[in-house]
């Protein structure tokens, strides 16, 4: 029954060929034989053959003036590589065809290319898409279709847009399937996407074979698959994938145009199984000619679906007809081969004399065809646009395009200016329905539900448990792991683009003691005992040779911790230190200056400053120095002296307060300095030093030159403190080496006793450990960056470090972990303005006094007048009034003399005014 259907179908095509060809034949035109090698009786090749004849009919009906007419000769390849080669040899040898259209598959094309090259007959294929055909480098082969590798950039753009880090190619085991892999692998490597596995489906795979392969894929963590195979095989694969649960939410399937362009040949069940997948589809631009052709096709062949291969066959035929017309009709013969010799059938085909000329014209033909612009570049068409579709229900929906210049865009007319600002996938593509009718973007990688959890090893620490602490719940007997490193890791897992199941396992012996140091723990990952290590593990070069580290999640190094000693010296002359020598001398000078100035202004009018010479000298010194501590007994009566004394009182107030504050600071403050300043001084002295047990620091110290006898290990902060307090003379150490994260914890506990003076060794920090090649490394590193840039990192740091640093600053960010208040010695520069004010007031007061004195003593002995009492001064009258009020026993006498005193005072004032008004 099946054979009879094929027979009648072939018979129909034969009569249609004859009908269409006869319409294009005119008497007097040169008939040129061309061959078509195709799988006669199959749907897609039959569509292409019909399009070939429609192309010839349309071409010659619109160009009746052309002198050539192509005559199509069909060779049935019988869906076989050898059959295709046999058909081609028969067409060349018996029909002497000048060119061959076809064959259908890439495997068949390999042989035909060799035959065409041997006989100089151009082979124009409209369906062989394998990139491997290009490697044959035959000038007589033309690909009137798109090479499969041309779409890898669109696939790469999609994977990069969604941030998937691993993909698994699923392809057919033949030339067509394998051809795309080299370019696809290179493109994915450009964006750091791994291919952990390649799923190769045999050409004649059974349902059982496909199920076994799909189960392998299901048990892998990767959830992104790229399918490149024939549409018929893809239908079977997706039906099985849906049955096995690989079309649920979380999976991503991307189909190449090899599947999408042949989608119409798949039955409805197969299409429904593909719901949610993404596809790369050949973009056919809309045109009036294309719409007209589609209408004609539906009228003539309503039962047959037009596809892109038919359009390419139509354009390839048009191009060949144009090229043959341009090549002319001269020398269309084949050169004969000497058949007398023992030659093979392939060698006996002869050489086409028309081939070289036709080769040139085919290479230069250019026109706008039904499938778009037609022009050969290096023997093949060059695509610039691919359409991105999303399978929904029993159909497909366009969600965007990929263009060579702009990448992924929603619309082709999108302006390039706006493309540069796009940042998220909804800006590039339309809404997508993923497998399982999911609307959220799949993460692309997850631990299989039937797979095991990650076994994560954690170090068992004795001291510094703020970073990692392992305890056992006495009620449930379960292990409890806490600490800064653990909390940071859990925050990183929350920031991952997919779910990761894990379980912590302490690296300890059955008795609870540590099972080894960090090197031993890291080595367990290399041996496969642990899937990862989380803790205070330092990134080192020797460790990275057998494991992979993530980016550091915490800065680290090696700090040198030394004791502090107070270097402030307190002696019997400490009271002089608050003020500089210059300030002491300046103050002393001003004491004498103020005392002498006040005596000068007061001794002629104030009895307190008169008397014998020795009495007046002692009064000067007494008055000058007594102003510093208490009010002097001597009264100050003149305006100039009072102004000077008030100013000097203010200066003394400021000076004494500053002196008191500086002296108090000097007597109570500490100037703490380290006992040792560098590692080189330790080596030079041969001092004993301490180091953290189970850390890499021991190896660093041995490399530096410290003898083993001078190295003392410790586990806890308390042990380190005890060793440093003892000192090297009492069985302790002179200094200790700790990692900088532990330095923060140690100095937070002993901030006023020790100091970090140097970081002699630089390392890359703390990182999480994974096996070499683990796909988790890149994603965990990106998640570390996300957490480090978020408020969560500050929150974790405050939770585990600030509680010990509340009374002490951060010893890492602040180089001086024990800042002290050092007394500052005061100098003249701090008070020069005050001294200047006193000096100016003094000069003004003395200047006025001198002027008045000289004015009143004109022509007299100045020195005698200077020593005499000024009886004419108004101060004398004021002094008498004050004295009379202060003597109660003379109250009657004072009362009787009131009128006389008032009269005398007024008379003196009037006399002074008449003498010099300014002297009041």
From Swiss-Prot:
Q: Which CDD domains match?
A: GluR_Plant, PBP1_GABAb_receptor_plant
What are the disulphide bonds in this sequence?
Answer: none
The record ties this protein, via InterPro entries, to: ANF_lig-bd_rcpt, GABAb_receptor_plant_PBP1, Glu/Gly-bd, Ionotropic_Glu_rcpt, Iontro_rcpt_C, Iontropic_Glu_rcpt_pln, Peripla_BP_I
Where is this protein found?
Membrane
Which SUPFAM superfamilies does its entry note? Periplasmic binding protein-like I, Periplasmic binding protein-like II
Q: Which residues lie on this side of the membrane: Extracellular?
A: 25-580, 657-830
- Where primarily located? membrane
Sorted keywords for this record are: Glycoprotein, Ion channel, Ion transport, Ligand-gated ion channel, Membrane, Receptor, Signal, Transmembrane, Transmembrane helix, Transport
- Kindly list the GO molecular function terms attached to this UniProt entry: calcium channel activity; glutamate receptor activity; ligand-gated monoatomic ion channel activity
Q: In which tissues is it expressed?
A: Expressed predominantly in roots.
Q: What quaternary structure, including any partners, is listed in this protein's UniProt entry?
A: May form heteromers.
Q: What is this protein called?
A: Glutamate receptor 2.2
């Amino acid at each position: 029954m099946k054979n009879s259907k094929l027979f009648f179908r072939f018979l129909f095509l034969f009569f249609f060929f004859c009908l269409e060809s006869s319409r294009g034949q005119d008497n007097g035109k040169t008939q040129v034989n061309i061959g078509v090698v195709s799988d006669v009786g199959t749907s897609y090749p039959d569509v292409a053959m019909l399009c070939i004849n429609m192309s010839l009919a349309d071409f010659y009906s619109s160009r009746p003036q052309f002198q050539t007419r192509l005559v199509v000769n069909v060779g049935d390849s019988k869906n076989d590589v050898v059959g295709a080669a046999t058909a081609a040899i028969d067409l060349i040898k018996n029909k002497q065809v000048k060119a061959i259209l076809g064959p259908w598959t890439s495997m068949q094309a390999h042989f035909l290319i060799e035959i065409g090259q041997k006989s100089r007959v151009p082979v124009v294929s409209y369906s062989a898409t394998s990139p491997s055909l290009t490697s044959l480098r035959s000038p007589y082969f033309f690909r009137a279709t798109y090479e499969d590798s041309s779409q890898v950039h669109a696939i790469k753009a999609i994977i990069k847009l969604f941030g998937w880090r691993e993909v698994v190619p699923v392809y057919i085991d033949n030339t067509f399937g394998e051809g795309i892999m080299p370019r696809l692998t290179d493109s994915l490597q450009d964006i750091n996407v791994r291919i952990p596995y390649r799923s190769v489906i045999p050409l004649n795979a059974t349902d059982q074979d496909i199920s076994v392969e799909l189960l392998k894929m299901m048990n892998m963590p990767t959830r992104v698959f790229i399918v490149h195979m024939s549409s018929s095989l893809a239908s079977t694969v997706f039906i099985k994938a849906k049955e096995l649960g690989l079309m649920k939410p979380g999976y991503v399937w991307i189909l190449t145009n090899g599947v999408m362009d042949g989608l119409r040949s798949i039955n409805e069940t197969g299409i429904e199984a593909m719901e949610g997948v993404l596809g790369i589809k050949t973009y056919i631009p809309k045109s009036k000619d294309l719409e007209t052709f589609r209408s004609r096709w539906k009228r003539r062949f309503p039962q047959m679906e037009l596809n892109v291969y038919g359009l390419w066959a139509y354009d390839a035929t048009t191009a060949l007809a144009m090229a043959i017309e341009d090549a002319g009709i001269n020398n269309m013969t084949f050169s004969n081969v000497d058949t007398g010799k023992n030659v093979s059938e392939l060698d006996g085909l002869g050489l086409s004399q028309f081939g070289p000329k036709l080769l040139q014209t085919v290479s230069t033909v250019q026109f706008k065809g039904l499938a778009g612009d037609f022009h050969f570049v290096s023997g093949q068409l060059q695509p610039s646009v691919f359409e991105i579709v999303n399978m929904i229900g029993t159909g497909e929906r366009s969600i965007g395009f990929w263009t060579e210049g702009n990448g992924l865009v929603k619309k082709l007319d999108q302006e390039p200016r706006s493309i540069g600002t796009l940042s998220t996938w909804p800006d590039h593509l339309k809404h997508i329905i993923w497998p399982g009718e999911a609307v959220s973007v799949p993460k692309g990688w997850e631990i299989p539900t039937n797979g095991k959890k990650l076994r994560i090893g954690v170090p068992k620490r004795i001291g510094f448990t703020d970073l990692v602490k392992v305890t056992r719940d006495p009620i449930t007997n379960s292990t409890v792991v806490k600490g800064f490193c653990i909390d940071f890791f859990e925050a990183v897992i929350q920031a991952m683009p997919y779910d990761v199941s894990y379980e912590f396992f302490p690296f300890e012996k059955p008795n609870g003691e540590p099972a080894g140091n960090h090197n031993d723990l890291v080595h367990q990952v290399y041996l496969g005992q642990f899937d990862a290590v989380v803790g205070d593990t330092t990134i080192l070069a020797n460790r990275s040779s057998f494991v992979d580290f993530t980016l550091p999640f915490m800065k680290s190094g090696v700090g040198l911790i030394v004791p502090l000693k107070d270097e402030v010296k307190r002696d019997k002359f400490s009271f002089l230190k608050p003020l500089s020598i210059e300030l002491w001398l300046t103050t002393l000078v001003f004491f004498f200056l103020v005392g002498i100035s006040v005596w000068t202004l007061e001794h002629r009018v104030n009895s307190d400053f008169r008397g014998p010479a020795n009495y007046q000298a002692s009064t000067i010194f007494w008055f000058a120095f007594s102003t510093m501590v208490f009010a002097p007994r001597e009264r100050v009566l003149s305006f100039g002296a009072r102004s000077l004394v008030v100013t000097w009182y203010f200066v003394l107030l400021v000076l004494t307060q500053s002196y008191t504050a500086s002296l108090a600071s000097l007597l109570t403050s500490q100037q703490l300095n380290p006992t040792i300043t560098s590692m080189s001084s330790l080596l030079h002295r041969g001092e004993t030093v301490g180091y953290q047990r189970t850390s890499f620091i021991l190896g660093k110290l041995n490399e530096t030159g410290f003898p083993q006898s001078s190295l003392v290990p410790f586990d806890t902060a308390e042990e380190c403190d005890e060793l440093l307090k003892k000192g090297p003379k009492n069985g302790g150490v002179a200094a200790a080496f700790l990692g900088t994260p532990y330095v923060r914890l140690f100095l937070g506990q002993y901030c006023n006793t020790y100091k970090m003076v140097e970081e002699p060794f630089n390392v890359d920090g703390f990182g999480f450990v994974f096996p070499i090649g683990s796909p988790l490394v890149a994603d965990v590193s990106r998640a570390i960056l996300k957490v480090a840039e978020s408020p969560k990192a500050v929150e974790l740091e405050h939770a585990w470090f600030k509680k010990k640093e509340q009374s002490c600053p951060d010893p890492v960010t602040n180089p001086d972990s024990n800042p002290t208040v050092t007394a500052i010695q005061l100098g003249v520069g701090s008070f020069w303005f005050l001294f200047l004010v006193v000096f100016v007031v003094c000069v003004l007061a003395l200047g006025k006094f001198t002027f008045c004195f000289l004015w009143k003593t004109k022509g007299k002995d100045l020195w005698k007048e200077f020593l005499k009492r000024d009886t004419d001064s108004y101060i004398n009258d004021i002094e008498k009034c004050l004295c009379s009020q202060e003597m109660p026993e003379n109250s009657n006498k004072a009362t009787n003399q009131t009128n006389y005193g008032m009269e005398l005072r007024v008379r003196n004032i009037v006399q002074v005014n008449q003498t010099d008004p300014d002297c009041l």
